[in-house]
């Protein structure tokens, strides 16, 4: 099974006091089967840009610029045509059904569906209505 990490999983590992269950899961998983989306890079960059200047912001900016791209290298997934088509269908489904799906969450769901990946997230309720295979490393 190949996996797509939602931004919340990436962020958890960088928290000052991360959830040990999530860290244990990340340590145990075969990293060659773990992918991230460019949407996570956008979401993380936005979050860092909104932080006040300081050591934490600088450390996270360095992690995003250097560590993350090195760690995931060829496993950073772009929004290609297949993802875009799935995204369009998902956003239409969201609107028709009245079940909210944010633009970024739509890209995570579309990437998981287009690439046949299990989406690893804490926010399973946000994705469950859209047919995405999900895993919650928090075990909730």
Which residues make up each language-model segment?
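Short, conserved clusters of charged catalytic residues that mark active-site
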Residues: 17-21, 103, 119
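Short, well-structured N-terminal submotif of metal-dependent ribonuclease cores
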Residues: 1-40, 49-66, 125, 140
């Amino acid at each position: 099974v190949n996996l797509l990490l939602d931004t919340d999983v990436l962020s958890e590992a960088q928290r000052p006091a991360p959830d040990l269950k999530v860290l244990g899961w990340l340590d145990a998983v075969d990293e060659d089967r773990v992918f991230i989306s460019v949407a996570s890079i956008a979401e993380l960059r936005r979050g860092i840009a909104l932080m006040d200047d300081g050591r934490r912001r600088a450390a996270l900016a360095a992690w995003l610029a250097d560590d993350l791209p090195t760690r995931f290298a060829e496993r950073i997934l772009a929004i290609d045509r297949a993802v875009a088509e799935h995204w369009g269908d998902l956003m239409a489904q969201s609107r028709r059904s009245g079940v909210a799906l944010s633009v970024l969450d739509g890209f995570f769901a579309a990437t998981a569906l287009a690439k046949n990946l299990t989406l690893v997230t804490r926010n399973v309720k946000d994705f469950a209505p859209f047919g995405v295979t999900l895993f919650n490393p928090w075990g909730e």
